[in-house]
Curated annotation (Swiss-Prot):
Assembly and binders: Interacts with GTP-bound RAC1. Interacts with CDC42. Interacts with RHOA. Interacts with CCPG1, which results in specific inhibition of its exchange activity toward RHOA, but does not affect its activity on CDC42.
Entry-linked PROSITE patterns: CRAL_TRIO (PS50191), DH_1 (PS00741), DH_2 (PS50010), PH_DOMAIN (PS50003), SH3 (PS50002)
PTM sites of type Phosphoserine: 457, 480, 620, 1033-1034, 1041-1042
Membrane topology of the entry: Peripheral membrane protein
Gene behind this protein: MCF2L
Name by which UniProt lists this protein: Guanine nucleotide exchange factor DBS
Ranges where the record places region Disordered: 557-625, 955-1058, 1116-1137
Residue stretches making up the SH3 domain: 1055-1116
Length: 1137
């Protein structure tokens, strides 16, 4: 805290000016650091408790409150006494009491105030001599003279030297005054020395004429009003000086008691507040000085106007007093400026210190975080591309952290500069500067150490990559040499030269010594990398061994005797397959760049072609298997390389773009349209990255030594590939956002930092490209693994990947549906989608009416779900990319629980019928090709069959519960038909095997025809579910009702004889089963139990039972087709004539 200071302004004894009192201990206090001497008038002294208790606000050197002219201005204006400025012979001040008739009426208080004020004006030295009173009573009476003199003598507050009285001039009053004065002389002597004067000339004997005013016969120029104005101005100025001193004292105390703040904001606020107050104090000083100069100027003008003898001593004293006050103000201002300069310097140094400390805390936090982050960078890379990516990350991290390092170094230099400028907090600044330099050096050293390790790792991986490429080229060379051409001496010599020439390149490309590699790269070798180096070395050694064997073999062939020898093809023998070892987790050794795969496709395709020719020539199974194994390894190598490259590219996008969107240092580059849109732009790319990096890539590496089994890896993780569907569904939104913001400086800056040649949108397309790439690689692998152990897994994996691609493609169409009020997710899985030509045929009431509102078909896009089929209208969109994709306006939907199909429509192999609610609504659908129609019919049949199975199982379960809890209804039931149908239904459910697909679409058992004229009840010939079973009953009753209406309601329904086409092979069954194949034509003989029909093959004449579900199309006189509904019955509508 600053030392406390105060200003004391008082009047110097013996003068009418102001000064600071001298105390015994003043000399000691002036020796303190903050003692500032102003003058002998105003002094800045150190405050103490004793000094604070003293009265410091006195302006007059008296014990009472001093009077000012302004306070008794009205009393002074009465002019019953005035101080003209005249002096006696010894310098005594002269106070004149002019003739004032109402002198006796003046109140004592007024008289006392005027006397006190007049006697306080001269200096203490002049007042000490004593005052001379001139009482003019020439026009008064003696009684008044006596009373006046006695009153004056009794109330005069100062020393009296002489009282001169001009007695009355009337004869009577003069005679009376002489007599009275003689008799009362003793009274006057006891109180004041009084001299009675008869005339003015007598007065001149005591006081010189130059010291008397004109009314007393003198020459002294005196104007009472002018004197009163001068006194008021001088005293006003003196009061201003006093108030200024008090203000400076208060301000100095405030500055001294102010504690230094601990933060930048508070220090700045204190400095600004003190500066404003200092400016105000300086303004008050300026106004006081201006006022003093104005008063001094007026006094000097008055002196210049008058003659030299007319200038009295009081005027000179007034002028000197004003000059002294002005000098005091100037000295006070200088002392205050000096004090303020020290205070301001300390506040500014405090502010500099707070800025330094704040910057130190910020930079230290950044450097500590950077040091912690660099400490986590322990990965040295598992491939060349990975190391290059790590080096780019390190360079980017160093660039970002370099700003903080430069700031720390600059801050350290600022601290050194503060120390050089003699800052008061040197002991606090110097350690912080040293710590900043230490942090910067430590961080730079860690960056350099990390860069050195990665450079070593890069060098090692480049050597390994070179060795791997050399091995691959050697394998390509061996695979591309035709064995049949090597049988001749010339061919063997040519092949031998190729091998020897290739082996000569090994000195530059292969790893010479394994221990030397371990020793040279000891600082970076971990367990995984050592294993990787070992396997590369083993691969190199194995390849060299194969080359040496081939070389020895070729040398023998080249050295043979040239004589005709009948070539004999070796007998093909099955190669003993060694069991594939349990795959162990290892790091991939191949380069992760996607270009590698592209460069290798040409050689191994050429090798495959030449080996195919070679196999035709020699027919060697062993050579063929070896060649296929090489090709499988190439496909596996390409799969791993492209997978690693894919993972690296995803990581690059996530760290170089997605993470930077949350970086505060890059926020100013983001456009407003990108705020909070990271999930829209990148979708679930992070989820895809974590799946491939943590799971799929590592599992793929386990199959490096047995690539033919890689299909198992795909099958085990097939459900995880569903994440691509979410990404593809978000792709239109992502691409739309990219088109809006592709020119954003943020993307350009990120691309520059990553050193990418392609923009972000190319990398956002990578997941879509990758999911389509798998099926191509699986096809290649399957092509070279037909007779291997994992061929079935490869085939299943390929089918599953194609199914995922189809699901992704279908979902892209599904999200384009507009106008559907419900939730598409409630409709179940999307099975198929496609565009068709559709005609409608409706039936209303009990009469069937064809409503062909259009002669031209409607173009509709159908979406087949598990629970409904949707009809939509396709609308083409204008735009680019995904915005050009069509949208689909929803028109109507059909619940699959009430849908039936007619597989063939007469006259067109591409048409089929979808009918609804017992053919109340019929939709004739024409597919683009017969194949598409067959696929849709088959898929719809699967849906209806699965619904029927679920219905039958539920019905059997309920029937079983009812049979255990309720007795069978009595024959005397009020509804015999209904009761009979329930019993028959229960028997049917017991007979039907729920696991047999032959019973899914069977008709009711018909052991004998029903009685003529009674007809069939709706429940006696169908496997309908109870009424509470999800709508199956209502759907079936509508179908049967439709059948009855179309038959006209006449008598019982009979089986229509005719021919049927077999649509599914049937080779299994009992001794009475008829073996048929798809496409055979059979004739219906009898409908039996459990969904079996008894038919005859007209070609062979054989008869037997076949499942009714295998018979689809009836070829008879009616020309109508068999239909399948969700109720599961084979519905045979009546032929119309």
């Amino acid at each position: 805290m600053f030392d406390c200071w105060r200003f004391i302004l008082c009047k110097r004894p013996g003068s009418n000016s102001y000064s600071s009192p001298q105390r015994p201990n003043e000399a000691k206090k002036e020796e303190t650091d903050h003692q500032i001497d102003v003058s002998d008038v105003i002094r800045l002294v150190q405050d103490t408790p004793e000094a604070t208790a003293m009265a410091t606000d006195e302006i007059m050197h008296q014990d009472i409150v001093p009077l000012c002219a302004a306070d008794i201005q009205d009393q002074l204006k009465k002019r019953f006494a005035y101080l003209s400025g005249g002096r006696g012979q010894d310098g005594s001040p002269v106070i004149t009491f002019p003739d004032y008739p109402a002198f006796s009426e003046i109140p004592d208080k007024e008289f006392q105030n005027v006397m006190t004020y007049l006697t306080s004006i001269p200096s203490l030295q002049d007042a000490g001599i004593g005052f001379i009173l001139v009482i003019d009573r020439r026009r008064d009476k003696w009684t008044s003279v006596k009373a006046s003199v006695l009153r004056i003598a009794a109330s005069f507050p100062a020393n009296l030297q002489l009282v001169l009285v001009l007695r009355p001039t009337g004869f009577f009053q003069r005679t009376l005054s002489d007599i009275a004065f003689k008799f009362n002389r003793d009274d006057f002597k006891m109180k004041v020395p009084v001299i009675m004067l008869s005339s003015v000339p007598d007065l001149h004997g005591y006081i010189d004429k130059s010291q008397l005013t004109e009314d007393l016969g003198g020459t002294l120029d005196y104007c009472h009003s002018r004197w009163l104005c001068q006194r008021t101005a001088i005293e006003s100025f003196a009061l201003m000086v006093k108030q200024t001193a008090q203000m400076l004292q208060s301000f100095g105390t405030e500055l001294a008691e102010t504690e230094l703040p601990n933060d930048v904001q508070s220090t700045s606020s204190v400095l600004c507040a003190h500066t404003e107050k200092k400016d105000k104090a300086k303004e008050d000083l300026r106004l006081a000085l201006k006022e003093g100069h104005s008063v001094l100027e007026s006094l000097r003008e008055l002196q210049a106007e008058g003659s030299e003898p007319s200038v009295n001593q009081d005027q000179l004293d007034n002028q000197a007093t004003v000059q002294r006050l002005l000098a005091q103000l100037n000295e006070t201002e200088a002392a205050f400026d000096e004090f303020w300069a020290k205070h301001q310097q300390k506040l500014e140094q405090c502010l500099q210190l707070r800025h330094f400390e704040q910057g130190f805390r910020e930079v230290k936090a950044i450097l500590d975080a950077a040091s912690q982050k660099i400490a986590t960078f322990t990965d040295i890379g598992n491939s060349l591309a990975h190391v290059e990516h790590l080096l780019r990350d390190l360079a980017s991290f160093e660039e970002k952290s370099g700003v903080a390092v430069e700031r720390a170094r600059a801050l350290s230099l600022d601290g050194e500069q503060l120390i050089g400028n003699k800052h008061y907090a040197v002991d606090s600044i110097r350690p912080k500067c040293q710590e900043l330099r230490h942090l910067c050096d430590q961080f730079s050293a860690e960056i350099a150490r990390r860069r050195g390790l990665l450079s070593k790792s890069l060098e090692l991986h480049r050597r390994l990559e070179t060795s791997m490429k050399w091995c691959d080229e050697g394998i390509y060379l061996l695979a591309s040499q035709p064995v049949d051409k090597c049988q001749s001496q010339d061919g063997a010599e040519a092949a031998l030269q190729e091998i020897e020439k290739f082996l000569e390149t090994g000195a530059e490309n292969k790893i010479q010594e394994l221990n030397a590699i371990y020793k040279e790269y000891e600082s970076i070798l971990n367990q995984d990398l050592m294993e990787h180096v070992r396997k590369v070395f083993q691969k190199q050694a194995s390849m060299e061994e194969v080359f040496h064997r081939r070389q020895a073999s070729l040398k023998k062939l080249a050295a043979r005797q040239t004589r005709p020898v009948q070539p004999v093809a070796p007998r093909p023998e099955a190669l003993a397959k060694s069991p594939c070892p349990s795959p162990g987790i290892r790091r991939g050794s191949e380069n992760s760049s996607s270009e590698g795969g592209a460069l290798r496709r040409g050689p191994y395709r050429r090798a495959k072609s030449e080996m195919s020719e070679s196999r035709q020539g020699r027919g060697s199974a062993g050579e063929e298997e070896e060649s296929l194994a090489i090709l499988r390894r190439h496909v596996m190598s390409e799969l791993l390389d492209t997978e690693r490259a894919y993972v690296e590219e995803l990581l690059c996008v996530l760290e170089g773009y997605a993470a930077e969107m949350d970086n505060p240092l890059m926020a100013h580059l983001l456009s407003t349209g990108l705020h909070n849109k990271k999930d829209v732009l990148f979708g679930n790319m992070e989820e895809i990255y974590h799946f491939h990096n943590r799971i799929f890539l590592r599992e793929l590496e386990n199959y490096t030594d047995c690539p033919e089994l890689v299909g198992r890896c795909f099958l085990e993780r097939m459900e995880d590939f569903q994440i691509y569907e979410k990404y593809c569904q978000n792709k239109p939104r992502s691409e739309s956002l990219w088109r809006q913001c592709s020119d954003c400086p943020f993307f350009q800056e990120c691309q520059r930092k990553l050193d990418h040649k392609l923009s972000l949108d190319s990398y956002l397309l990578k997941p879509v490209q990758r999911i389509t790439k798998y099926q191509l690689l699986l096809k290649e692998m399957l092509k070279y693994s037909r007779n291997c152990e994992g061929a079935e897994d490869l085939q299943e994996a390929l089918s599953s990947i194609l199914g995922i691609l189809k699901a992704v493609n279908d979902s892209m169409h599904l999200i384009a549906i507009t106008g559907y009020d419900g939730n598409l997710g409630d409709l179940g899985k999307l099975l198929m989608q496609g565009s068709f030509s559709v005609w409608t045929d409706h039936k209303r009431g009990h009469t069937k009416v064809k409503e062909l509102a259009r002669f031209k078909p409607m173009q509709r896009h159908l979406f087949l779900h598990e629970k409904a089929v949707l009809f939509c209208k396709k609308r083409e969109e204008n735009g680019e990319g995904y915005e050009k994709a069509p949208s689909y306006s929803y028109k109507q939907s059909l619940n699959m629980a009430a849908v039936g199909i007619t597989e063939n429509v007469k006259g067109d192999a591409k048409k089929f019928e979808i009918w609804y609610n017992a053919r109340e609504e019929v939709y004739i659908v024409q597919a683009p090709t017969p194949e598409i129609k067959a696929a849709w019919v088959n898929e719809i049949r699967k849906v209806l069959t699965s619904q029927l199975q679920a219905c039958r199982e539920a019905s059997q379960h309920r029937a079983l519960e009812q049979s255990q809890s309720l007795p069978l209804p009595a024959p005397t039931s009020t509804s015999p038909s209904r009761g009979n149908s329930r019993n028959i239904k229960k028997l049917e459910e017991r007979k039907t095997d729920p696991l047999s697909l032959e019973g899914y679409v069977s008709s009711a058992p018909l052991t004998k025809p029903p009685e003529k004229g009674k007809g069939w009840s709706k429940t006696s010939h169908s496997l309908e579910a109870p009424e509470d079973d999800g709508g199956w009953s209502s759907a079936e009753e509508q179908i049967n009702s439709s059948d009855a209406e179309e038959d006209g309601g006449l008598g019982p329904k009979k089986l229509v004889p005719g021919k049927y086409t077999v649509v599914a092979d049937h080779e299994k069954g009992g001794p009475d089963a008829l073996r048929v194949r798809s496409g055979d034509v059979v004739e219906l003989v009898q409908e039996g139990d459990e969904g079996l029909w008894y038919v005859r093959d007209p070609t062979t004449g054989k008869e037997g039972w076949v499942p009714a579900s295998s018979l689809s199309v009836r070829l008879g006189p009616s020309g109508s087709a068999q239909c399948l509904s969700s109720s599961g019955k084979a519905h045979v509508p009546r032929a119309h004539p």
